[in-house]
């Protein structure tokens, strides 16, 4: 039985993720300038995270606490495959953002829009290949009991673990390099040239603000996934857990060892791991909320709200008072 606090935390994380993703998506389509900004690429991982939240949410209505629906083997495996695909795609999009940051640091004349087709091919194609490869052992060893498998899926564990660690390290290294270039002022000003010194300086300032936001998105994802990665490694390394499902063998062990002393010990350990896994899922979902907070710092977004009187009076009162004084003189 999961503790009430971990269950509530997971539910709160899911709701905040939903709010954050809808906030980004809504403003992306509402404000045209956001669709032409360097930070427009964040819309793709936002859609992915929203879909992940929706697909994983039915675990709340399951009779037994688990990451996956337990009503049928087919539905459970399909849900698990979608979740695996979405997490991989989310990470690859974060790598694409990091690659853009490297271009901003080292290739000032590069047109980043030309890379988007390649980004789409990698972000949607590579996860599909990984899911197909890692699901084959599950099809062979499936015991027909709702995502419970007879043996650990070594291919899935090692392949995903290596990929996730590599993606996270790459994102952190790029963030460090980008921060170094921001401090030194070695960033691309614009895709076009100009003879106006003032215009160039404005472009530099704007680019720096966008880059600061861009480098936060991959870092937020990597930080939010660290706990899940560590627990997945621990879970796989213990004899009580396999990689076929998040809590697969733990629940079976509870049923088999219910009346034994060793069973009680296993139950306590498994329950503790289940709580941590639920908490790690909640932390991962908070990525959507944190991304929305970063997105809120967009000058294009804030400029649009400044044009709305009620928001200008509440959040930019000084500017509203200054405008009123000018209107009075005029």
UniProtKB/Swiss-Prot annotation:
Primary role: Receptor for cAMP.
The protein's name in its UniProt record: Cyclic AMP receptor-like protein E
Pfam families: Dicty_CAR
Topological region Extracellular: 1-10, 62-85, 138-156, 235-274
Membrane spanning stretches: 11-31, 41-61, 86-106, 117-137, 157-177, 214-234, 275-295
GO MF annotation list: G protein-coupled receptor activity
Protein family (similarity comment): Belongs to the G-protein coupled receptor 5 family.
Topology in the lipid bilayer: Multi-pass membrane protein
Cytoplasmic topological segments: 32-40, 107-116, 178-213, 296-330
This protein's UniProt keywords: G-protein coupled receptor, Glycoprotein, Membrane, Receptor, Transducer, Transmembrane, Transmembrane helix
Glycosylation sites: 269
Entry GO CC: plasma membrane
Compartments in which it is found: Membrane
PROSITE patterns per UniProt: G_PROTEIN_RECEP_F2_4
InterPro entries referenced in this protein's UniProt entry, alphabetically: GPCR_2-like_7TM, GPCR_2_secretin-like
Main location: membrane
